[in-house]
């Protein structure tokens, strides 16, 4: 796994310090714009759908994501540092 950029360490630690979904929502509402939160959420949804074998066209229609976004997420799933897969696996385990 790649080492996180130094400037982001405090951010990652801050996120890890949160105890609940409510605390996380409050933090992200202060940290990000509504659009940024929507974009991040959309990417995670795209990753889940790609991981589930959905086709680009279905993902585009369901999520409203552009093919460029879908391609970028797919590239991260295939060649990235494993973050999407880690989160998707953890979400599957917690269901």
Positions of the model-derived regions?
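Short alpha-helical "recognition helix" segments of helix-turn-helix
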Residues: 58-63, 70
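Major-groove recognition helix of helix-turn-helix-like DNA-binding domains
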Residues: 46, 70-78
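Short, solvent-exposed alpha-helical "recognition" segments
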Residues: 75-88
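General nucleic-acid-binding
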Residues: 1-18
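Short, amphipathic alpha-helical "recognition" segments used to contact nucleic acids or chromatin
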Residues: 40-54
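Short, Lys/Arg-enriched anionic-surface-contact patches
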Residues: 23-42
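Intrinsically disordered, low-complexity basic tails/linkers immediately adjacent to helix-turn-helix/homeobox/MYB/SANT
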Residues: 87-95
């Amino acid at each position: 796994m790649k080492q996180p950029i130094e400037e982001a360490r405090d951010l990652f630690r801050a996120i890890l310090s949160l105890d609940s979904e409510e605390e996380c929502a409050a933090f992200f509402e202060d940290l990000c714009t509504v659009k940024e939160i929507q974009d991040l959420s959309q990417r995670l949804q795209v990753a889940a759908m790609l991981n589930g074998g959905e086709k680009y066209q279905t993902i585009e229609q369901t999520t409203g994501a552009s093919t460029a976004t879908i391609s970028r997420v797919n590239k991260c799933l295939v060649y990235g540092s494993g973050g999407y897969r880690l989160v998707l696996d953890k979400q599957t385990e917690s269901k």
